[in-house]
Amino acid sequence: MSRIGKQPVPVPAGVDVTISGQNVSVKGPKGTLTLDVAEPIEVSRNDDGAIVVTRPNDERRNRSLHGLSRTLIANLVTGVTEGYTTKMEIFGVGYRVVAKGSNLEFALGYSHPVLINAPEGVTFAVETPTKFSISGIDKQAVGQIAANIRRLRKSDPYKGKGIRYEGEQIRRKVGKTGK
């Protein structure tokens, strides 16, 4: 049995979980999230009120979906209680970010500024012109928008200029040596 999948998902106080067939809806202090669980996987509540994920048999696909479904449900519970935040940094001369309403405007050395719109449920916060954070209750949405922003100007291995996650280490390369 999946080591992750067999663990029940604890439901903290103040969180309401509704299970109807393959649909799991989690409502908490920060909002509501829903998830459609893949077909062979079954979701139920145990006597303690925790969420239990089970699979019908040990086929390879079912084993894979078992742990995945349990983790996605745990992410929903964490999202509606604590939320998710990703911090990012910008390195490079003249590179900066400015908040324009709920959107971000980047100056990244291109001939034009790059505008990123905040998707529903995601908020941006600019601490300094080179540091900003992305917050939301949906882990997948926060991670995807962070990856899209990072892709605007990936960090250069020679000079280290670009956008990166806070604390991310960039492998540096040695440049050409002159004669």
From Swiss-Prot:
InterPro entries: Ribosomal_uL6-like, Ribosomal_uL6-like_a/b-dom_sf, Ribosomal_uL6_a/b-dom, Ribosomal_uL6_bac-type, Ribosomal_uL6_CS. The keyword Transmembrane does not apply. One of its GO terms (molecular function) is structural constituent of ribosome. It comes from the Bacteria. GO terms for cellular component: cytosolic large ribosomal subunit. GO terms for biological process: cytoplasmic translation. Keywords: Ribonucleoprotein, Ribosomal protein, RNA-binding, rRNA-binding. Pfam families: Ribosomal_L6. Belongs to the universal ribosomal protein uL6 family. This protein binds to the 23S rRNA, and is important in its secondary structure. It is located near the subunit interface in the base of the L7/L12 stalk, and near the tRNA binding site of the peptidyltransferase center. Part of the 50S ribosomal subunit. NCBIfam families: L6_bact. This is Large ribosomal subunit protein uL6.
